[in-house]
Every structure is written in C-alpha cells, then in structure tokens.
Amino acid sequence: MSLRIALIATVLIAIALPAIAADAQLSAAVASHQRASENTVRDRFRHPAASLAFWGLKPGQTVVEIAPANGYWTEILAPYLKATGGHYIAAEGKDGQKLPAKFADRAVYGDIGYTVFSDSSGALGSAGSADLVLTARNIHDWMWTPGFAEKGMGDFYAVLKPGGILAVEEHRADPRPQIGDARDGYVATATIVSMAKKAGFVLEASSEINANPKDTKDHPFGVWTLPPTRLSGPSGQPGNPHFDHSKYDAIGESDRMTLRFRKPA
C-alpha cells in the first residue's frame, strides 16, 4: 500500500468514526433496559432508530420535543443527547405538567429542560436556539382549536436555528380525504405541508418508514380504536366490555406520515 493510499484511508477512517460512534450511541439508547416495556413493544410499529436517522438526529444537538406524554421518545432522546453532549427539552402544556418522575434521574437522562407549549404560550425558547423540533402524533389535537396548529408551526420556526429541522410523525388520512378538522385523528399530508410552508419551512423529505397498508382508516372510534389506545366506545364515555378488538389489533398501530421539514439557512 502506498503512503498516499494509507493517508487517504486514515482520513476516511477518522471521518467515519464519529458517525459510527453516534450510531452506536443511538442503538444503545434504543436497546436500553431503562425503557419501559410498554414502549419497547411498540418499536415494531414506530421504528425509532430508522425514524430518528431519517429526521437527521445528530450528536450534540438541542432537541425540543412537543408534548412528549409518557416519554416514548424521551426514553431514547434524553440518554442519547446526554451521552453526546446535547440537550433534550420537553415542551409541555400550559398546566405545567412534567414528564414521569423517573426522568428526573440525571445519571440516565441528563438535565432535561422544560418549556411550555399551548394555544396561548409564548416562545418555546430563545430564537434560533434549537437544532431539531419533534412533534409526534400531536397535530390532529391542535386542529380542534382554531389557529392552534398554525401558531405551533410559527413557534417551531422561531425556536429553530437556520437550517434546523422540524420532524413530524402523524396519523395519515391519505389516500382518502381528511374528515373536517381531523376529529378521527387522521390528517391529510397536504394539510400539514401547507401549514408548515406558510410558516416558512421547506419540505425536505418524506418517508414510508411508519406506513401501515393494513390501516383502513374507517374505524368506529377513529384512530384510537387501534392499539395502543384500543377504545371500545366514544372518547370520554364508558367502554364496551363486549367489543371485539381482534380486527383492530390485527391492523396494529396507524398508518403514519413521516416528514422532515427544514428552516432555510
């Protein structure tokens, strides 16, 4: 091997090693025994490693997750960002809700930051301070309050750095039309793309990672008929103990769009 070839090989290895290490950190976070079993069992539907790689998660980023609920993504993102020198921020509702108590363990999850996100909240953080904003299966809820989803898109745009990423996972109505303001939980891809573009974002890529062709999208209690919610009656009313879940369990979790938007640099 010539000296020139050896030098080129050394440079290529040096370039590749950080990416390999980052992949290893993400794999470790996904495989961690710290994750709840009710979350890991959903990985076959939510494809966390592939989704995060598609969205452009990188070591050392500042990531804001909108409405993380029980922490499906928090269990992965917070340890990963702690290990790679980044920062995880949870954007919760105006009632001051915080993540489950286990996430206070700094040795595992790092120093999780909190901010407020609602239809009347202020900025998510300092302008241009975040590398990535993640919203997973939330937008349909905001559409029931006039102007809320549009406000959200503006908030995300403001907190992101130039070149920053808006990562979206949402129940997909396509190819059938969206029903009104998505009361069944299914949103048309065109609806979200339009809102994001009006806020200034550019749609950079879409993926079928979280597609589910078994989802017929005509369930009696909307998307919540499917796992993991498995409603057996209208939302807010007592369930039907005789409801047959088998058809819906066989479908699995919903068909979802997976989108990556970018704030222009």
State what each model feature region is.
Residues 82, 143, 160-161:
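Helix-to-beta-strand junctions that scaffold the AdoMet/dcAdoMet cofactor pocket
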Residues 163-171:
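Conserved beta-strand signature within the Rossmann-like core of class I S-adenosyl-L-methionine
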Residues 123-133:
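A short acidic, Gly/Pro-enriched loop at the edge of an enzyme's catalytic core
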Residues 26-54, 58:
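Class I SAM-dependent methyltransferase Rossmann-like catalytic core
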Residues 243-265:
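C-terminal lobe and adjacent flexible extensions of AdoMet/dcAdoMet transferase-like proteins
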Residues 149-162:
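A short glycine-rich, Lys/Arg-flanked "PGG" loop and its adjoining helix->strand segment in the class I
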Residues 179-205:
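Conserved Class I S-adenosyl-L-methionine
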Residues 60-69:
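Conserved class I S-adenosyl-L-methionine
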